[in-house]
Amino acid sequence: MSRDGHLRPPRLGLLNYMLKALESDGAKDVVFIPVGINYDRVLEDRSLVRSLDPEAERRSTGFALKKTFGFIGHNLALMIRGRWFRFGYACVNFGAPVSARAWIEENDVSDEAARQKSVDALGRHLMHSVGRVVPVLPVSLIATVFARRGGEPISELDLKVAAHALQTELEEKKARIYVPHADTDYALSVGLRMLTLRHLIIEKDGLFTVGLDEMPVLQYYANAIAHYFEPLEGPE
């Protein structure tokens, strides 16, 4: 989980260490399993986004405890009144395994320069593999529509039309899209509801817009699938 929601670069130093170890006789193979995870709700999302601002005032332990107990109390009150909703969906996908030994056999690691080049290529390949299996969830889909529009007000109908078009674009890119109950309209409604309940999205006069100062948090969820629309280095 990154602080801004984006996929992060691989740790090449660790990969280099692994490949070096595999060059010794009798060393066991290392197999990488690409894992893509996404969440409709990350409990510490505001804290993660806030940590990116170097000028943000540091919060005290007392403030953190107050917010935690306030969060628990608020959700208990919603449960008692029958107005509590789940925090959305979490989804995980697995990609094709990548054998480090097979990678060594197929790539030149005869000297330090060649090994470093191979490590760089392996890192790109692994992150490409992870990116291809990151699931697209309702909140990320809706958040992306708002992020692309810069927070401009939009009706629910136009929002869903834009989200449908975005989903079609993602399907063409062979993205793993999770559609609860196999109902796209329901999925989009759930994503919108999640964001409005948290006041990240505000409804007024039949139009939805981004809440005051909430675009960074909304962008955090859009960033989870942003790599599908950017060039991914690695083999297809």
Residue ranges and their predicted role:
Residues 1-236:
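Membrane-interfacial terminal anchoring regions of lipid-handling membrane enzymes
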